[in-house]
Amino acid sequence: MQQSYNPQNSLTATTSYSEQEIVCICESLFNEGLQTGRTEQLANFIYNLPQCYQVMESVLKAQALVYFTTQNWKMLYKLLECSKFSPHNHTVLQNLWLDAHYKEAAKTKDRELGAVCKYRIRKKNPFPNTIWDGEETNYCFKSKSRNVLRDAYKKCQYPSVEDKRRLAQQTELSIIQVSNWFKNKRQRERAAGQLDRSSARSNDSDDGSSGCESKPPMNIDSPAPPPLPTSFDLQPYYPSPYTFAPHCDFSYIQNL
């Protein structure tokens, strides 16, 4: 029978684990916390670790998620600004950074944030260099990601599901984001009179409405594009689940 987690026994348990076991447990509980929004078990585990383990990157990342779920914004910002994280952790921590600022601003304004307000928040609160490699982003799409998508678009304007999955892995985006980029790219070129009409097919039905790059130059003789809406509604943001190392043995978690 699987042993249930008992916070009263956590101090004894945490002192008996090796560093690798602590990393595996933290990563698993972190991923579970991202999915469920519940971090009580994660908090009990890391708070009872010996002081020498408190500076481990997996523990610091777990602490950041606990601060996020408990809406302790100041401590979250301080931790992310003062602790250097490895590049493979940047994306998930950047998501926490942005979502925390969005939630904090929405609570202050007592209303849901629009696209313009979120854009201003991102400009006012850039990522600290502890979770950012310094590469320029455009609507949260990195330059290298946009270049990969542009090259793929030149080869095929209607990628298959498998192509989208491959591009999502290459660009570190979701399949929906890749689908939206191709859809909006086709729409912009159609409006500019640049898309080959014979290539338009019924599979131009990807869901979503988020674009990533600027409009192409307009031809004076081309038909004018439809007017832009006066407001924009963004889909709710959910942090992406963290993918942990394959060597982690999660059998340790059964003993919690």
Curated annotation (Swiss-Prot):
Shows expression only in the pharyngeal nervous system. The keyword Zinc does not apply. Residues 187-233 are annotated as: Disordered. Residues 134-193 bind DNA. Disruption phenotype: Exhibits early larval arrest phenotype. Does not affect the number of pharyngeal cells or the expression of pan-neuronal genes including ric-4, ric-19 and unc-11. Several neuron classes fail to acquire their neurotransmitter identity including 7 cholinergic, 4 glutamatergic and 1 serotonergic neuron. Alters the expression of neuropeptidergic genes in pharyngeal neurons including the reduction of glr-2 in M1 neurons and the elimination of mgl-1 in NSM neurons and ser-7 in I2, I4, I5, I6, M2, M3, M4, M5, MC and MI neurons. One of its GO terms (molecular function) is RNA polymerase II cis-regulatory region sequence-specific DNA binding. Pfam families: Homeodomain, SIX1_SD. It is found in: Nucleus. Signal peptide: none annotated. GO terms for biological process: mesodermal cell fate specification; positive regulation of apoptotic process involved in development; regulation of DNA-templated transcription; regulation of transcription by RNA polymerase II. GO terms for cellular component: nucleus; transcription regulator complex. Keywords: Developmental protein, DNA-binding, Homeobox, Nucleus, Transcription, Transcription regulation. Acts as a transcription regulator. Binds to the sequence motif 5'-TCAGGTT-3'. Binds to the cis-regulatory element of proapoptotic factor egl-1 gene and together with eya-1 activates egl-1 expression to promote motor neuron M4 sister cell apoptosis. Also promotes apoptosis of I1 pharyngeal neuron sister cell. Together with eya-1, required to specify the coelomocyte fate in embryonic and postembryonic precursors. Required to establish and maintain the differentiation of all 14 classes of pharyngeal neurons. Interacts (via N-terminus) with eya-1 (via C-terminus). Belongs to the SIX/Sine oculis homeobox family. This is Homeobox protein ceh-34. It comes from Caenorhabditis elegans. The gene is ceh-34.
